[in-house]
Amino acid sequence: MRAILFVDDHEVLARLSCEILEMQGYRAVSAYNGTEALKKFDEEDFDILVTDFRMDGMNDVELAKKVHEKNPEVPVIIVTGYGPIDGGKDVAACLQKEDLFPALLEKIKIFLGEREPRPQEVKTA
């Protein structure tokens, strides 16, 4: 079963998002800040990291960089309520929170090789 780490400082959003991902057949684990996410990343393997753009302490770009230092193959998807952002080279995609599902599910399927991207979906960061 493919594993997804979902990081958001809004615990309710993180838990609900994990429930939706689990209903789609993924193993989903939540973390509520970057430090907790890195600890969980050290404890187990994840196929994808989904992280909030703004969090207390470590932000999304710092978290993506640290995750890629450990495993550069893990796609990082940023979710934000602040409009389009550029996450840099460590970010595979950026999605708006208000349109999170089903867009997140589509990106996950693409990054896990479960679906071919349409030409306009190749990179949206």
Put a short name on every predicted segment.
Residues 33-36, 59-63:
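Acidic catalytic/metal-coordinating carboxylates
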Residues 55:
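Receiver (REC) domain active-site loop signature in two-component systems and cognate sites
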Residues 90-113, 117:
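Output/docking surface of receiver
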